[in-house]
């Protein structure tokens, strides 16, 4: 599902799509597809980690150790060499900026490719999880009906 929007754009089946910025970045920069991201009106969403309280790795502290490692400044900056998702820590941005061009191709600056870059956050919409929980079924049905009529 995540690969479909950039594929539809690259194949000329659609002229506009929404999707994960990392997929669009990979298509445009990684694969050279003739597409471009538009950040005006982007939808900003949050991601969360959840630990199972009183699980075997919670009680012995291993779950928190792994979480701390996965979300360390260095690890988050390192992941940006491969995908343009914004790191969860602002401290990671400094590492990325200091190492630009940061992308694995050695020529692409990553900070401007991220949804949280200052020039990309001038007019974003914050995802409303409650709205989607309340309306997902109805909207999905309308979406499928609209697509069937194309």
Label every PLM stretch briefly.
Residues 1-38:
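Ligand-binding pocket segment of bilobal, Venus flytrap-like solute-binding proteins
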Residues 6, 10, 18, 64-71, ...:
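Non-transmembrane alpha-helical segments in soluble domains
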Residues 115-150:
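Conserved C-terminal helix/tail region of periplasmic/extracytoplasmic solute-binding proteins
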Residues 13, 21, 28-31, 70-74, ...:
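Sec/Tat-exported extracytoplasmic proteins
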Residues 52-120:
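Mature extracytoplasmic/periplasmic domains
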Residues 32-53, 104:
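Periplasmic-binding protein-like
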Residues 3, 57-61, 130-137:
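Soluble non-cytosolic domains of exported or imported proteins
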Residues 22-26, 42-44, 56-57, 74:
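Solvent-exposed loop/turn segments at secondary-structure junctions
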